[in-house]
Design a protein with these regions (language model features):
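Tryptophan-rich substrate-binding surfaces of secreted polymer-degrading and adhesive proteins
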Residues: 2-150
Length: 150
């Protein structure tokens, strides 16, 4: 029988393996952003001291209740901020799964625009789905671009 310490070590190893597998699939483009968010438990947390220079583009991290995808490999210790404030380095992932909807984050230029069928969790606690591609508006700003998920 395993000790508690051994069990925890096995769980850490499994978590690291799952994170590496998801990172590989994301970098290869063999999973969608929806699938990445569906497997968010395997997404590593953003570390502001980590060197992401050797990480492949599209590798996911979680931060501030969002999943971010690496756009530009870099050493985070050389930058002040988080993915939400370093949008030239990190892109926002979106989901088409209403059960995993994330809070709305304003797009940054063309990065992070909401495409048709992508979902958000709005400030009223309700889930909305975009009915238009290249959607940069909130449900409050341009309601016709969003449909309430019942």
């Amino acid at each position: 029988m395993m000790t508690k310490t051994e069990s925890l070590e096995k769980m850490r190893e499994k978590g690291a393996y799952d994170a590496q597998q998801l990172q590989s699939k994301a970098a290869a483009g063999t999973v969608t952003q929806t699938e990445i968010i569906d497997e968010e438990i395997a997404v590593p947390a953003f570390d502001p001291k980590k060197d992401y220079s050797a990480w492949p583009v599209n590798s996911p991290v979680s931060d501030e209740d969002q999943v971010w995808l690496l756009l530009q490999p870099h050493n985070a210790a050389n930058y002040e901020g988080r993915p939400s404030t370093l949008r030239a380095l990190w892109g926002l992932a979106h989901t088409k799964n209403p059960a995993k909807a994330k809070p709305f984050v304003a797009p940054y230029g063309t990065s992070g625009m909401y495409m048709k069928d992508e979902c958000i969790l709005w400030t009223d606690g309700k889930v909305y789905v975009s009915v238009a591609d290249n959607n940069v508006y909130t449900p409050a700003e341009y309601a016709q671009n969003w449909k309430l998920v019942e």
